[in-house]
Amino acid sequence: PRTLSRGDQQRVAIASGLAMHTEYLVLDEPTSGQDGREKKKLMSLMEQLKAKGITILLVTHDMDVVAKNCTRVIVVANKEIVFDGVPSDLFLEENRPGIWGLTYPPAVLLGRCLPGAPYCKDMDTFCAKFLEIRKERVR
């Protein structure tokens, strides 16, 4: 494993967990060392696993993963739980992530610029909301 890249090490670790046919998968910073394409594939895999009923407990600083893949978020700051809820509640409250040193995912920021400030977990959601609003305005 020492000769593998960080991304390859992550993929081997995930494959090892899946080989055990477990109901739970624990991932520590799974997108670290992944390029954009590999990160997208990993996020898609996590969605597929979730659809199969596998519970994923993940530790991450990657807010794109949180916005797109998580159904529950626990934020720990200074050894205390400061937030426990759903991603939309975390990201839609003004400045909440920033006070803990977290960054907003680009899709969330763009969504906040649209009328009604809808929650956009990813760019596909943002584009769909944008086109929906545009279509309504053209009528």
Task: Annotate each language-model stretch with its function.
Residues 1-4:
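Conserved ABC ATPase signature
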Residues 14:
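Hydrophobic anchor residue at the start of the ABC signature
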Residues 25-28:
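Catalytic Walker B motif of ABC-type/P-loop ATPase nucleotide-binding domains
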Residues 60-61:
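H-loop/switch region of ABC-family ATPase nucleotide-binding domains
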Residues 66-68:
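A short, surface-exposed alpha-helical micro-motif characterized by mixed small hydrophobic
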Residues 80-107:
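Conserved beta-strand-loop-alpha-helix hinge in the C-terminal portion
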Residues 97-139:
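ABC ATPase nucleotide-binding domains
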